[in-house]
């Protein structure tokens, strides 16, 4: 199976959220690189990224940027065509920075680098308890099925389950699932699987022309997909934080 894998390090990793807000996790505090990368994204997919709301996540940095640098980044991103609207919730320093910038914090995109205090050693484990029979496994949530076409401007979300679409997903439409997505018609809009961060979710489609596909926030737009995969039956999955696409034999 032919697959697609882009192997390069970007200054900022952009993830797509299920609420239509993108999360820019800053890896390298290089304002010019971050702005140029965002400008290129907007140029490649203006309908997707033009004037898109963006959350800035500084959790991948060892030090929070100073106020002047953060202001320069926000201004540069606005000039690149997106709208930075908040910071990802994180440390007390990020809280202070958000106040100085006059932007809110969003806990949904929680930063993950707050230094942890040295914790005391854990208490000794309790003596083993008498073995009890395991409770019956919980039944998985039933998947959601959409029998009719998802038209431009519509959004369909399958919470805590897979999504099956028996018809087409039109351009400008969006289908989202916390699990995997199966599309038996043409996919011309956007499909976002693993919306709550499940990296094992997949997307299956019989006729692939997607504007965008995303798994656990990692995404790929149509312009980045080889021509020989367009119009084919494909599967999409995540491998080492990279979106891969392959034809179904």
Swiss-Prot record:
Positions of region (Disordered): 115-144
Record key words, sorted: Cell cycle, Cell division, Septation
InterPro entries for the chain: CAP/MinC_C (IPR016098), MinC (IPR013033), MinC_C_sf (IPR036145), MinC_N (IPR007874), Septum_form_inhib_MinC_C (IPR005526)
GO annotation, biological process: cell morphogenesis; division septum assembly; regulation of cell division; regulation of cell septum assembly
Pfam families registered for this protein in UniProt: MinC_C (PF03775), MinC_N (PF05209)
Comp. bias (Pro residues): 118-139
Record-stated family: Belongs to the MinC family.
Function recorded in the entry: Cell division inhibitor that blocks the formation of polar Z ring septums. Rapidly oscillates between the poles of the cell to destabilize FtsZ filaments that have formed before they mature into polar Z rings. Prevents FtsZ polymerization.
Subunit composition and interactions: Interacts with MinD and FtsZ.
Protein name per its UniProtKB record: Probable septum site-determining protein MinC
Provenance organism: Xanthomonas axonopodis pv. citri (strain 306)
